[in-house]
């Protein structure tokens, strides 16, 4: 995600708010509450502020981002908390899965050991988070706190020595 696109995080955070079927969505001003502003205010200034974007043409249509913050999904001072959102018309197409996997790969390369998030229990995204390896480590009456341990990939490395593939 380009620095000039960080301004979209506030709007995307609003899109990440789960609204149960039949409930009215909250006003957009809800994103200005202090407990939600920590997700986007000053983004890019923290040591583990990272964001990836899905773009359609020149429009950012979704993002996954993380940072060290004392938020709903806070585990400890070394575990970044993650947020993910797509505009509704882009959901269900695998974009969120790809963004999450790309973020996990990027964090692994940086040596990050784990990442957390909070999600409303009724949010269909719970299935997505489980599918990419998050597990529930704590819960409240309304939400799950989930954690994904980021393990170094074990791979097979091939070397080309004197024209021989070993």
How would you label these PLM feature ranges?
Residues 1, 84-86, 119:
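Hydrophobic adenine-recognition pocket in adenosine-nucleotide-binding enzymes
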Residues 1-11:
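A short beta-loop-alpha structural element at the N-terminal edge
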Residues 17-19, 25-78, 83-89, 140, ...:
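Acetyl-CoA-dependent GNAT
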Residues 83-86, 92-109, 126, 130-131:
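Conserved acetyl-CoA-binding loop-helix of GNAT-fold acetyltransferases
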Residues 96, 100, 122-125, 142-148:
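Short glycine/proline-centered loop/turn elements that form peptide/ligand docking sites
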Residues 107-120:
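Conserved GNAT acetyl-CoA-binding A-motif
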Residues 130-140:
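Conserved acetyl-CoA-binding loop of GNAT-fold acetyltransferases
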């Amino acid at each position: 995600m380009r620095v000039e696109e960080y301004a979209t995080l506030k709007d995307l955070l609003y899109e990440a708010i789960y609204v149960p079927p039949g409930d009215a969505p909250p006003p957009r001003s809800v994103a200005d509450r202090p407990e939600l502003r920590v997700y986007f205010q000053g983004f890019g200034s923290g040591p583990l502020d990272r964001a990836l974007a899905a773009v359609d043409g020149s429009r950012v249509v979704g993002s996954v981002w993380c940072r060290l913050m004392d938020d709903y999904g806070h585990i400890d001072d070394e575990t970044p908390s993650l947020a993910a959102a797509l505009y509704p018309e882009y959901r269900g197409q695998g974009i969120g899965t790809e963004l999450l996997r790309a973020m996990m790969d990027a964090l692994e390369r940086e040596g990050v050991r784990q990442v957390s998030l909070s999600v409303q229990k009724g949010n269909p995204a719970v299935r997505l988070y489980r599918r990419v390896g998050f597990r529930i480590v704590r819960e409240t009456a309304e939400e799950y706190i989930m954690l994904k341990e980021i393990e170094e990939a074990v791979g097979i490395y091939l070397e080309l020595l004197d024209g021989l593939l070993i």
